[in-house]
Amino acid sequence: MHVRIVFYLLPASGKTTREEVYTYSYDYADRVSKVEHTLGGSKITLYDCDYGKFRRLYTKLLHGSATNKQSYTYNVCSWLTGISGTRFTQNLYYNTGVGTAKYNGSISSMTWKSGNESTVRGYKFTYDGLDRVLNATYGETASISTNANRFSENVTGYDKNGNIKGLQRYGQLSSTSYGLIDNLTLTLNGNQLSCVEDAVSTAAYGTNTAFVNGASVAGEYAYDANGNLTKDL
């Protein structure tokens, strides 16, 4: 194990200069195993983890508190199958679960639960012949069947470069109803997005993240010579 220490001085006019220190500890494989933060002589552990004998992340402790501990599980292929903790739990299924079995590492279904929630939420995934996602079908409970399709997403087409040409998204329409919030058509110039049109006009409700179409012109997005986005109408 070796350690790297980074110092910062925090000067401010009329104030006492304070010293801030980050201490990084590494294991035998040169992976970060612990990060400690010291400010004004007070030290806390930001990150403390264990990789285990198979070199996979098994546990992660945040802010030095067992309350913020996360544990990770894997299958025999070393694919991540679960994250468990007091604040977040997630399960990933490949050739098991309620989705269509996948044996190539693609996820067939997933479930998760946040904090003290009692509701288990999840998605089932389907893929095309090139193993690109076509449908992410939402549901609740372990069977991913209750309140089906409330937040589903469907890719309606890809171009020859593998870029998405169409996307349908479902979400909350009112306090009691759910439905289609986006029906997007994406136009590209090569691999650069140039225009997005939405066939559905739905105002955001609650945490609804419906697409907002700011303009309907051919060149809604523009880029510089390096491909960085410079305009979004």
Describe the role of every protein-language-model region.
Residues 1-233:
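Acidic/glycine-rich beta-solenoid
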